[in-house]
């Protein structure tokens, strides 16, 4: 199973969407500065994960979550879950 994940910067509240076999291990990599984009926005926390059966479906879901419609869906999902601390201002 592939995990699509969304992480939020605790520094500037920006979001990053990606996919990995192990989302927690990938989060550690983001927080250690191994990713050029996320390095300057550390530290990060996971705000959303979703399992996909394979890389192809994971990539489609990642692409959707990066779209305007996907971001709207994610904001609505977070609002409904009751954890609004991760919502953009």
What is each of the regions a protein language model found here?
Residues 1-89:
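Structure-specific nucleic-acid interaction/processing domains
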